[in-house]
Amino acid sequence: MRLGKHVSIAGGLYKATDRATKIGCNALQIFVKNPRGWKIKEVSDSEIKKLKDNIKKENMYPLVVHSSYLINMATPRDELWEKSVNSLKKEYKRTELINADYFVVHPGSHTGKGLHFGINRIIEAINSVFGEVKNGPQLLLENVAGAGSSIGSNFTELRDIINKVDDYARIGVCLDTCHAFAAGYDLRYEDGLEELLNDFDKIIGLDLLKVIHLNDSKYGLASNKDEHAHIGEGEIGEKGISNIINHPLLKDKPFILETPKFSGRDKDVELVNLLRRD
């Protein structure tokens, strides 16, 4: 089982691997910059080499990069859209530089301008990134909880973006379990999970599902609220999480936890390993 967690890069990118292995992970997710700002600091060749060496030494896979928080590919505000695209390009270049496997991005919000407008704006943004960075890793669109005018809470919206991206080989999906539950898929039960997988396969295709963000949900079914809970302590619960990680179509996918931090041992990592049936 490939199980990782989103970990801090404080003190250097390469220190993320130490944090991941310390809590029992063999995969990881990071930001490549401060996620709450536009600036991106330079990183030295030695820092990048240390990260690559650590990844190889610990046999960690995949290395997933998550885009920063301020990016909105769907915004009608030209200045924000330009900033978003420029930041995406810089982060995507760094993702390529460190040999990361995937780059996860939230589609964004059209803020009232309309779904059609927002989707076209997202397509334009991704094509601009791919046009400048020719050999980067797969960019994964993440499903969202469905609050407000956000795009990507249903698979049809994600498909409409994917089908019009110029470089189809470089696009995929990251499925967030908390977001799917918040958007209406009842992952507490096997029937709800089967419904999700059937819809995903019919609309997008399971071959494009590359990474799963394994998160419990603080809020109830179809709440459209995005707040992650510790595994087994949220509304999806242990049984629901167990169904997900042991499903024949999902068990070989990489799982990344984005649950709240623990001060010591990571009980989420431990519980997921206990729930896994080999």
From Swiss-Prot:
GO BP terms in the entry: base-excision repair
**Where along the chain is Zn(2+) 3 bound?**
H179, D226, H228
Superkingdom to which the source organism belongs = Bacteria
First-tier enzyme category under EC: hydrolase
Q: Tell me which Pfam families the record gives.
A: AP_endonuc_2
Q: Which cofactor does it need?
A: Zn(2+)
UniProt KW keywords? DNA damage, DNA repair, Endonuclease, Hydrolase, Metal-binding, Nuclease, Zinc
Q: Which GO terms describe its molecular function?
A: deoxyribonuclease IV (phage-T4-induced) activity; DNA binding; DNA-(apurinic or apyrimidinic site) endonuclease activity; phosphoric diester hydrolase activity; zinc ion binding
Bridged cysteine pairs (disulfide): none
Instruction: Describe cofactor binding as the record notes it.
Output: Binds 3 Zn(2+) ions.
Q: Which residues bind Zn(2+) 1?
A: H66, H106, E142
Q: Where does Zn(2+) 2 bind?
A: E142, D176, H213, E258
Could you tell me what this protein does? Answer: Endonuclease IV plays a role in DNA repair. It cleaves phosphodiester bonds at apurinic or apyrimidinic (AP) sites, generating a 3'-hydroxyl group and a 5'-terminal sugar phosphate.
This chain's protein is named Probable endonuclease 4
